């Protein structure tokens, strides 16, 4: 069965060798064409879980294209014929834009191509794909405005926006134990225990579920702290105490989130994926359990990135890390250049957006890297996430080039130069010099073996070389070879 498909309601097709009750090995519920199904041992990568499904296709899984079209037409007809149009131009503009977006979302949810996930429902992931398109178009619109117009345009979204942010004091007293404060000497620690602590933990837990690799998560976590150190001269909120960077963030929040995420991945890898239709389950307890498991994956794939296996995979993993770090930095820089308070709901909505699209994008990237086909296309969600990250960066560059061009401190630039040189040196050695050296050694070894084989061939010919006697060959071998036997 083709990757990314699931058996339809009819169960196994007559042409398929799949045993009854077995489903495809991937998540979406779209049925394949005849003859495309394969058994659990066929067409499945070693990192993919085995799935058993009774093939039930209920009303819940159908596309409902005509139903959505009918409801949409009735709604537009009601607004057009029965509702009086207000005379407020600004209100009508907002309502027209929102209605246009909703119509596009209705079209996308019913007609867009399914992605790699199907739980809780394929329409859910199609919805976020369409939201990605809308968000990218919104960013493009902001990018083509002047700095002042772009900031003031956000007033149409929230009248409280478009106002310069007040300056805040970051960093400050970094003593873990403050002897001058007799009432509470640990007040600096308690001040840091705000709502961002559980947010950091939850964020890294979800990122671990996206990336599915401990090393990549730790590298991104540590590198972002280095970026905060490096850019605190540009953004004041990057200025934190050393223990806030390495103890609170890396070890406690990020580390604990990554640990819990890896434990969840371990459970998902070992879990048995056996699905039944809700009405095929006899007990109420089983039905409730089936409803709860609807919000878990249909199947599971372990990610084996193997960055050192080839130059292509190494560059791809480096690109993934770069996009992750840029998306993290864009969160802070966009708030700064667009004058958004950290607690504004738009900031939270952006994080919710990336949580929903990030997992699909990572799966599409992994399939793109892992597929042996040379001309496979990158998935649409991964393409949009990369485009959104790049567009956000361009907005930051356009809206506040002065902040971005503030020169790095000398010791910071030296550290990044040294790190870049080491990474480049390792890349050249691992994928060029090392391969050349190995090929040279292999060529020498093959030449030496060929010479040795030629010498053995001459030695086993009709006439033995000088100095070869029967003590080496033995009498039987000597007679068989035509050598003179002793008297």
UniProtKB/Swiss-Prot annotation:
The biological processes this protein is annotated with in GO are:
phosphatidylserine biosynthetic process
Specify the domain of life of the species encoding this protein.
Eukaryota
**Topological domain ranges for the Lumenal compartment:** 84-96, 148-313, 357-376, 425-487
Effect of pH on activity = Optimum pH is around 7.5.
Tell me how this protein sits in the membrane.
Multi-pass membrane protein
Q: Which residues carry this modification: Phosphothreonine?
A: 485
Topological region Cytoplasmic: 1-62, 118-126, 335, 398-403
Activity regulation reads: Requires calcium ions. Inhibited by exogenous phosphatidylserine.
Q: What is its EC number?
A: 2.7.8.29
Signal peptide location in the record?
none
Query: What Gene Ontology terms describe what this protein does at the molecular function level?
Result: CDP-diacylglycerol-serine O-phosphatidyltransferase activity; L-serine-phosphatidylethanolamine phosphatidyltransferase activity; transferase activity
Pathway listed for it is: Phospholipid metabolism; phosphatidylserine biosynthesis
User: Could you say which protein family the record assigns here?
Assistant: Belongs to the phosphatidyl serine synthase family.
Q: Can you name this protein?
A: Phosphatidylserine synthase 2
Q: Which organism is it from?
A: Homo sapiens
**Gene giving rise to this polypeptide:** PTDSS2
């Amino acid at each position: 069965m083709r990757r990314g498909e699931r058996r339809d309601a009819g169960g196994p097709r007559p042409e398929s060798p799949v045993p009854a009750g077995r489903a495809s090995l991937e998540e979406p519920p779209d049925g394949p064409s005849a003859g495309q199904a394969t058994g659990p041992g066929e067409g499945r990568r070693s990192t993919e879980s085995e799935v058993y499904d009774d093939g039930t296709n209920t009303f819940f899984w159908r596309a409902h294209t005509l139903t959505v079209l009918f409801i949409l037409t009735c709604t537009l007809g009601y607004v057009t014929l029965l509702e009086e149009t207000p005379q407020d131009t600004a209100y009508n503009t907002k309502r027209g834009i929102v209605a246009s977006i909703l119509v596009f979302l209705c079209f996308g949810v019913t007609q867009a191509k399914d992605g790699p996930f199907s739980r809780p429902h394929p329409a859910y992931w199609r919805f976020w794909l369409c939201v990605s398109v809308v968000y990218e178009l919104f960013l493009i619109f902001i990018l083509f405005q002047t700095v002042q117009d772009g900031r003031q345009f956000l007033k149409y979204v929230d009248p409280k926006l478009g106002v310069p942010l007040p300056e805040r004091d970051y960093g400050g007293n970094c003593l873990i134990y403050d002897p001058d404060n007799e009432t509470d000497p640990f007040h600096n620690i308690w001040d840091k225990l705000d709502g961002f602590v559980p947010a950091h933990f939850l964020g890294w837990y979800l990122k671990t579920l996206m990336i599915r690799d401990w090393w990549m998560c730790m590298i991104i976590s540590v590198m972002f702290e280095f970026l905060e150190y490096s850019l605190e001269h540009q953004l004041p909120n990057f200025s934190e105490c050393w223990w806030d960077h390495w103890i609170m963030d890396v070890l406690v929040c990020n580390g604990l989130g990554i640990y819990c995420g890896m434990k969840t991945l371990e459970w998902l890898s070992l879990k048995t994926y056996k699905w039944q239709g809700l009405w095929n389950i006899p007990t109420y307890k089983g039905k409730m359990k089936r409803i709860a498991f609807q919000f878990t994956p249909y199947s599971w794939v372990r990610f084996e990135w193997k960055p050192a296996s080839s130059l292509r995979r190494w560059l791809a993993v480096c690109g993934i890390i770069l996009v992750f770090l840029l998306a993290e930095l864009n969160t802070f820089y966009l708030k700064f250049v667009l004058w958004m308070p950290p607690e504004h709901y738009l900031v939270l909505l952006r994080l919710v957006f990336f949580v929903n699209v990030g997992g699909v994008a990572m799966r599409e990237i992994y399939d793109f890297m892992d597929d042996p086909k040379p001309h496979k296309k990158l998935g649409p969600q991964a393409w949009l996430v990369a485009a959104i990250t790049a567009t956000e960066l361009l907005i930051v560059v356009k809206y506040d080039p002065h902040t971005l061009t503030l020169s790095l401190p000398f010791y910071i630039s030296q550290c990044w130069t040294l790190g870049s040189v080491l990474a480049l040196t390792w890349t050249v050695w691992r994928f060029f010099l090392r391969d050349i050296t190995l090929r040279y050694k292999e060529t020498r070894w093959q030449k030496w073996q060929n010479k040795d084989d030629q010498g053995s061939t001459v030695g086993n010919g009709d006439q033995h070389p000088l100095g070869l006697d029967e003590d080496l060959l033995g009498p039987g071998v000597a007679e068989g070879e035509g050598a003179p036997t002793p008297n």
